[in-house]
Curated annotation (Swiss-Prot):
InterPro entries: Ribosomal_bS16, Ribosomal_bS16_CS, Ribosomal_bS16_dom_sf. It comes from Wolbachia sp. subsp. Drosophila simulans (strain wRi). GO terms for biological process: translation. GO terms for molecular function: structural constituent of ribosome. Belongs to the bacterial ribosomal protein bS16 family. Disulfide bonds: none annotated. Gene3D superfamilies: 3.30.1320.10. It comes from the Bacteria. Keywords: Ribonucleoprotein, Ribosomal protein. The keyword Thylakoid does not apply. This is Small ribosomal subunit protein bS16.
Length: 106
């Protein structure tokens, strides 16, 4: 089962409101999801703190267990709208392995 972190559209016509959800990639866009981890309201001003609200610990958890984020969610992360204190565990393991390999060579 491929799991994605994506936006699910809610709200009314011409008044979009999105939930940031973890869902099976085969599920419909607005259909069943595993967990709601945040929300995005594009109608709010860009400087409003409630425009994008995400549970960062749950986002980190899902990324660490292999969930793939969609382009828009990745954009939120890259722009600093959603902050991740540390990289996912897979990256940390590679760094430790690289440091061990360099230590053995020297």
């Amino acid at each position: 089962m491929a799991v994605k972190i994506r936006l699910a559209r809610f709200g009314a016509k011409k008044r979009p409101f999105y939930r940031i959800v973890v869902a099976d990639s085969r599920a419909p866009r607005d259909g069943r999801f595993i967990e709601k981890i945040g929300q995005y309201d594009p109608m709010l001003p860009k400087d409003n703190k409630n425009r994008v609200v995400v549970k960062a610990d749950r986002l980190k958890h899902w990324l660490s267990v292999g969930a793939q984020a969609t382009e828009r969610v990745l954009w939120f992360i890259k722009k600093g709208i959603v902050t991740l204190e540390t990289e996912p565990k897979k990256t940390e393991k590679k760094k430790v392995e690289n440091e061990k390999a360099q230590g053995q060579e020297a």
